[in-house]
């Protein structure tokens, strides 16, 4: 279910303040965050945000197409290595 329009999009305050400080100083550096739930705002465009996936921080470069999505969408938490192969074929 989508978030109510009257509530507006959510972004963690600490993340927004870090991005605003970088924008004022015209700096582009990697910002580490654990906030996968934050919505990507237009102010984030051009920055690289390292999003935590439960194991490590995955660097995500923010482009225009990502605005409105959540940060967690771009840092997958599960690694899929494929199903086990069928050994019957290799035995012959």
Curated annotation (Swiss-Prot):
Signal peptide: none annotated. Keywords: Ribonucleoprotein, Ribosomal protein, RNA-binding, rRNA-binding. GO terms for biological process: ribosomal small subunit assembly; translation. Coiled coil: none annotated. One of its GO terms (cellular component) is small ribosomal subunit. GO terms for molecular function: rRNA binding; structural constituent of ribosome. NCBIfam families: rpsS_bact. Protein S19 forms a complex with S13 that binds strongly to the 16S ribosomal RNA. PANTHER family: RIBOSOMAL PROTEIN S19P FAMILY MEMBER, SMALL RIBOSOMAL SUBUNIT PROTEIN US19M. Belongs to the universal ribosomal protein uS19 family. This is Small ribosomal subunit protein uS19. It comes from Bacillus licheniformis (strain ATCC 14580 / DSM 13 / JCM 2505 / CCUG 7422 / NBRC 12200 / NCIMB 9375 / NCTC 10341 / NRRL NRS-1264 / Gibson 46).
